[in-house]
């Protein structure tokens, strides 16, 4: 039986980072689609309107609503709390806070393709 193809929500305010992440993810045969959001508020709107997101890749430092705040909203919402979230950041000091707020994984930027694909596989199988 074939593995389910994943629909990933990538949240980052840096369009270059989003483009690089999308390029890495689309190389995987297990990814069907990548939905992009530029901040946590936009991402929450997407999650409320699309119930088929399988995993979230989330930057921490963003305007409007940052990653930690978005994590808190997700984990407080019965319809969203089960979604796996991988936090992506350049600030290693945010790891403890992110995990405490419900992140399922943590990767340091710059992201390596094999690391992000491995972490996604761990959390979605």
Predicted regions and their residues:
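Conserved acidic segment of CheY-like receiver
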Residues: 5-17, 21-25, 56
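Helix N-cap/capping motif at the beta->alpha junctions
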Residues: 36-45, 66-67
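Short amphipathic alpha-helix used as the core "switch/output" element in two-component signaling
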Residues: 45, 68-81
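Active-site beta3 strand of CheY-like receiver
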Residues: 51-57
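Receiver (REC) domain active-site loop signature in two-component systems and cognate sites
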Residues: 62
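Alpha4 helix (beta4-alpha4-beta5 surface) of REC/receiver domains from two-component response regulators
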Residues: 69, 91-105, 115-118
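Hydrophobic/aromatic residues positioned on beta-strands within the core alpha/beta folds
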Residues: 86-88
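A Lys-centered signature of the CheY-like receiver
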Residues: 109
């Amino acid at each position: 039986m074939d593995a389910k193809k994943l629909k990933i929500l990538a949240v980052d305010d840096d369009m270059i980072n989003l483009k690089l992440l999308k390029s890495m993810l689309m190389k995987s045969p297990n990814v069907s689609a990548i939905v992009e959001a530029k901040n946590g508020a936009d991402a929450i709107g997407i999650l409320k309107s699309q119930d088929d997101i399988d995993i979230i890749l989330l930057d921490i430092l963003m305007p409007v609503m940052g990653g930690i705040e978005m994590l808190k909203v997700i984990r407080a919402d019965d319809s969203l709390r089960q979604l796996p979230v991988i936090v992506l950041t350049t600030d290693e000091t945010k790891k403890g806070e992110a995990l405490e707020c419900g992140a399922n994984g943590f990767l340091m930027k710059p992201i390596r393709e094999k690391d992000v694909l491995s972490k996604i596989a761990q959390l979605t199988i």
